Amino acid sequence: SDIKVPVVTVDSICQNHNLTPPFLIKLDTHGFEVPIFEGATETLKNTNFIVVETYNFDIADKSLRFYQICQYLEEKGFRCVDICEPLFRKRDDALWQFDLFFIRDNHPTFSCDSWS
């Protein structure tokens, strides 16, 4: 049986609930990240930190793999700063999913490109 749920945007939630920035966005949406970000254009302008569960495989139609999420968010002014919780597929130990952490591309972390 199909279950119908209302779809609302992140921007409308923030506006309707008078939420004040700065924002942190955490997504664990199994391939639905782009439509969510598309509904968060204003919220993203006031977001400093994003955590996204990403995949190394195409898990859904139009889903983005981890490197594509990095490219997509870089276009929005964010860069990946950390990774955690890698999960490996049981049948062949292939890297399946992990969380990526993003901060603003103008954060002081990125002012130095050297190791030391």
Say what each PLM segment does:
Residues S1-V8, S12, H17:
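Glycine-rich adenosyl-binding loop in Rossmann-like folds that engage adenosine-containing cofactors
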Residues I13-S116:
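Conserved acidic-Pro-Pro-aromatic motif
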